[in-house]
Amino acid sequence: MTNRAIDDSRSLLTLGRVDSVRVQVGYRASPDDQVDRQYLLDLSVPEPDGGGGEDVLDEREILAALEPVLYAGAEARRHYSLHQHRWHTSWGASPGALEIGLLVNTGPRTTAVSEASYDGVARAFRDVMEVVGRPERTPTSRESAVQRTLRAAATAYAVDPDALSLRAEEHHAADNSWTLTLRSTAGDEYDVVVGFVEGYAGAVSVRHAHRIEAADSIGPE
């Protein structure tokens, strides 16, 4: 086979630079169990100084920033599943995206483990924002919060957003965050917090609550 030097500037197929980053972290008791809580972070990558097309984002720095999520209250890191996806389109604004998905196995999902998981993700997401570029904090409207809630639940649990209805909502103005509850036509509930990291709307947590079963109002005979 003949080796050929590759000129990146003339390549027809290229992934280009990374324009956006999505990180998704989920926790479950074991690989055979369902994920009970997911955390999503969506970030835009700032243009490099000088406006060049080079990719200045180091993916290894993002993975290093995510390491705190592996502990979830334990002294040693827990087992995990990691996948990474990169895509790019050649038309329009030619966006390039990097997606990182991480599932962590914690054993029994106790309250202490859940709280430690939350703290680890919040710390890791702050570090990822420093690596990628800290976004400007802007007020999140109710409409934007509802749309992000629907998209987050659909992304995290592969549910049809048209099958979800809003059951409850609460606005935390001081924190620039929203807490909303969705219910599917199948009876599943999703508790969503938009802006759980420093009020940034692109940081969303989704908890899959137990299915609501219809109760017999008469009771057993």
Predicted regions and their residues:
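Membrane-active, amphipathic/fusogenic segments and juxtamembrane/transmembrane anchors
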Residues: 1-88, 150, 154-158
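Hydrophobic transmembrane signal anchors and adjacent membrane-proximal interface regions, especially
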Residues: 15-27, 89, 100-106, 112, ...
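Short, ordered beta-strand-loop transition motifs
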Residues: 31-35, 92, 169-176
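Ampiphathic alpha-helical segments that act as solvent-exposed interaction surfaces
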Residues: 56-73, 105, 109, 206-218
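Short secondary-structure junctions
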Residues: 70-84, 161-169, 201-207, 211
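Amphipathic, membrane-active segments
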Residues: 120-178, 189
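C-terminal assembly and membrane-engagement modules of membrane-active proteins
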Residues: 167-221
